Each structure stands twice: as structure tokens, then as C-alpha cells.
Amino acid sequence: PGLLPTPVETASALAAGARSGLLASDVVASLTRAGQGFALGALLGSALGFATGYLPRLSAAVTPLVSFLRPIPAIALVPLATAWFGIGETAKRLLIAYAVLLAVWLYVHDGVSRVPVSHLRAARTLG
């Protein structure tokens, strides 16, 4: 007993945070951080996915590294990110970006690599 707050204590703390405005500012900060990390991860994952999907040599070089990193959850990299970047916003955004990048890369790479060559030729011809 006493290790965790009771539901009543949790609800009263939530209400106090909402009244003081602290809850709203913390939610905005969290959503901003998540959005920035997602945007960075999606941008890098898309660029890498297009490049590796379109260029077989680059795919052969990058795919083993990404396949090695994919099973490592972002939460497992928290100690490493903290050691390298500290406990500030940079480490948090980069961990979110890491989690997003690998998923986006996988789907973009797969989609681009499956485009038939005839469709690429037609697109080049049509401008």
C-alpha cells in the first residue's frame, strides 16, 4: 500500500493540473515533440525507402543494416540516447524519429521496389 496513488488521488491531481493550466501546456509540449519526431522519421524513412527501393545497389548495402536495427525497440535505446544527447528534447525527438523511420522505410522500400519497370518507362515517356 502507498506505492501508487489511488484512483481518487489521480483524478484530483488531473483536475488540479487542468485548473492550473499545467496539464494543457504539458499536452501541447508532448504533442509538439511527437509531431516533430514523426515528421523527421517519416521524411528520412521516405527518402531512404525511395532511394533503396529504386537503386538495387543501395538497397543491397542498406537493407542488412536496417534489418539489423528493426527488431531493436526504441525503448531499448533510451540509455544510449540519454548518454549521447542528455535528457533534453533532442534525445526524445530522435527516439520517436527512430521508431517511425524504420516502419516508414520498410513500407516505402517495399512499395517502390514492386513498381513494374513498364510503369517507370511509361512515367518517363509521359513526363
Question: Could you say what each language-model-derived stretch is?
Answer:
Residues 2-39:
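Periplasmic/extracellular loop-to-transmembrane helix junction in inner-membrane transport proteins
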Residues 46-51, 79-80, 84, 104:
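Alpha-helical transmembrane segments of multipass membrane proteins
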Residues 36-66:
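Transmembrane-helix boundary motif in ABC transporter permease subunits
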Residues 11, 20, 24, 28, ...:
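Alpha-helical membrane-protein architecture signal
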Residues 88-126:
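Membrane-cytosol interface at the C-terminal ends of specific transmembrane alpha-helices
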Residues 21, 30-38, 65, 69-75, ...:
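Loop-to-transmembrane-helix entry motif
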Residues 47, 73-78, 89-93:
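Transmembrane helix boundary and interhelical junction motifs in multipass membrane proteins
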Residues 1, 52-57, 81, 85-87, ...:
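Short helix-capping/hinge motifs at transmembrane helix termini and TM-loop junctions
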